């Protein structure tokens, strides 16, 4: 991670940390770095989620891109994976998504995609950061006919949906799907997609007003969907986040099915039909111990990466794997798209239910989940935790007490000013005790409370 770029682009409080002035500068510099080698008039696609600040930042970003001579196509409200897909198949020089994903409405972010639909390399981000910190703007300033132009391509979302439908073998008639769109980017896309696939649909979290994105709904609040599934007597619930790049599911009994379980279910099915490359699933260090055991017990392997879907994708690309993801619900199918995709994951999951004739509860029951607790501690310097001797000492103390029957992971968040404390243990009681013991020391040492 650099000065401006985190694990998922540039983020901050909109109009305070992430200002329109900065967005203009980022558009200008990002546009230059990503299109300077273009032989024709460069083209960049821009999408956004439903946050009130999206239009403000989009306007500034577009102005910056136009000032460097880029042809801009605005996609309107669309999911992050939708932007990645369209960037690739429309032969654009770059794509940009304006979103802070699952973060609160006050936050926003800007993430770039290269012409191949993948997120930027570290080298590209570093080049942009160097120019952002330059004392003087020496980039080209085209005039007249060489200035950029802007157009709208709002039908891009429908093009993306048509593509997704081609990735499944079954129609979903007879399956009642409850959708929670987090009042975000999938609010329209999800309903159209599942209706086209003949599912019976009930929806919540699909009335965005600019302020309600992720507010008690979506993949970070699946308990609301769990109640909704029971109320509507649905067969499955699918909760997306604000920008639609992650999915958390709920079974017909209202029980939450997380990203680890979803990865296992899909991995097992793909392996059975001969479509799981190298019989391997790529996950992160945050995956539950039960995931690793279930993968191994079913004749598959797992590879661990650092937390962040970009690291999962890097490992998948480097070693030719086609399935990976995170417990948080970022699931990547490299056969179909270049980034985590909630809608794609959702239809693959329902497709497996239809193909096997099994309920989601039956599919999920094949993986035992070990008790796990995650506590987020808000701090000013999240990286200082890695060098704190008292934090290191309490981690060692807890690990010794668990005697190999559990694990501890303490790390700085890649996108927020948080230290994440995760503990897995043999029992819920031990898990709770150990995670609070470590979190208390982190709070005391960092000098802040949640």
Curated annotation (Swiss-Prot):
Keyword entries, A-Z: Isomerase, Magnesium, Metal-binding, Phosphoprotein
Any GO BP annotation: UDP-N-acetylglucosamine biosynthetic process
Active site: 101 (phosphoserine intermediate)
Keyword Flavoprotein: no
Post-translational modification: Activated by phosphorylation.
GO molecular function: magnesium ion binding; phosphoglucosamine mutase activity; phosphomannomutase activity
GO cellular component, one term: cytosol
Organism listed in the record: Lysinibacillus sphaericus (strain C3-41)
Residues with PTM Phosphoserine: 101
Record bears the keyword Magnesium: yes
Family note: Belongs to the phosphohexose mutase family.
Protein name: Phosphoglucosamine mutase
Needed cofactors: Mg(2+)
A Pfam cross-reference name: PGM_PMM_IV
């Amino acid at each position: 991670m650099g000065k401006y770029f985190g694990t998922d682009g540039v983020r901050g409080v909109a109009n305070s940390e992430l200002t329109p002035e900065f967005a203009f500068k980022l558009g200008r510099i990002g546009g230059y770095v990503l299109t300077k080698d273009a032989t024709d008039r460069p083209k960049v696609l821009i999408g956004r989620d439903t946050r009130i600040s999206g239009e403000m930042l989009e306007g500034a970003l577009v102005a910056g891109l136009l000032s460097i001579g880029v042809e801009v196509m605005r996609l309107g409200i669309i999911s992050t994976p939708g932007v990645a897909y369209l960037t690739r198949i429309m032969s654009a020089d770059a794509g940009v998504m304006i979103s802070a994903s699952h973060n609160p409405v006050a936050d926003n972010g800007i993430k770039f995609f290269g012409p191949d639909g993948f997120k930027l390399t570290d080298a590209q981000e570093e080049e942009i950061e160097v120019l952002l910190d330059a004392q003087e703007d020496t980039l080209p300033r085209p005039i007249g006919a060489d200035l950029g132009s802007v157009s709208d391509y709002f039908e891009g979302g429908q093009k993306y949906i048509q593509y997704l439908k081609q990735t499944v073998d079954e129609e979903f008639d007879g399956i009642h799907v409850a959708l929670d769109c987090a009042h975000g980017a999938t609010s329209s896309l999800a309903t159209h997609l599942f209706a086209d696939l003949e599912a019976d649909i009930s929806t919540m979290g699909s009335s965005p007003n600019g302020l309600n994105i992720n507010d008690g709904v979506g993949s970070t609040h699946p308990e609301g969907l769990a109640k909704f599934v029971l109320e509507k007597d649905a067969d499955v619930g699918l909760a997306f986040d604000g920008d639609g790049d992650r999915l958390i599911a709920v079974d017909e009994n209202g029980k939450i099915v997380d990203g680890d379980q979803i990865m296992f279910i899909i991995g097992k099915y793909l392996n059975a039909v001969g479509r799981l490359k190298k019989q391997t699933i790529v996950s992160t260090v945050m995956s539950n111990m039960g995931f690793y055991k279930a993968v191994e017990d079913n004749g598959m392997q797992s590879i661990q990466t650092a937390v962040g879907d970009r690291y999962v994708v890097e490992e998948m690309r480097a070693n030719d794997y086609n399935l990976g993801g995170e417990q948080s619900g970022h699931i990547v199918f490299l056969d179909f798209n270049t980034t985590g995709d909630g809608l794609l994951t959702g239809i693959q999951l329902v497709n497996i239910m239809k193909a096997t004739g099994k309920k989601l509860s039956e599919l999920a029951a094949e993986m035992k989940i070990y008790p796990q607790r995650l506590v987020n501690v808000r701090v000013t310097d999240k990286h200082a935790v890695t060098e704190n001797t008292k934090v290191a000492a309490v981690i060692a103390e807890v690990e010794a007490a668990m005697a190999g029957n559990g694990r501890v992971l303490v790390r700085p968040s890649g996108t927020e000013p948080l230290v994440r404390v995760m503990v897995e243990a043999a029992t819920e009681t031990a898990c709770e005790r150990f995670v609070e013991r470590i979190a208390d020391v982190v709070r005391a040492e960092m000098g802040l409370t949640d």
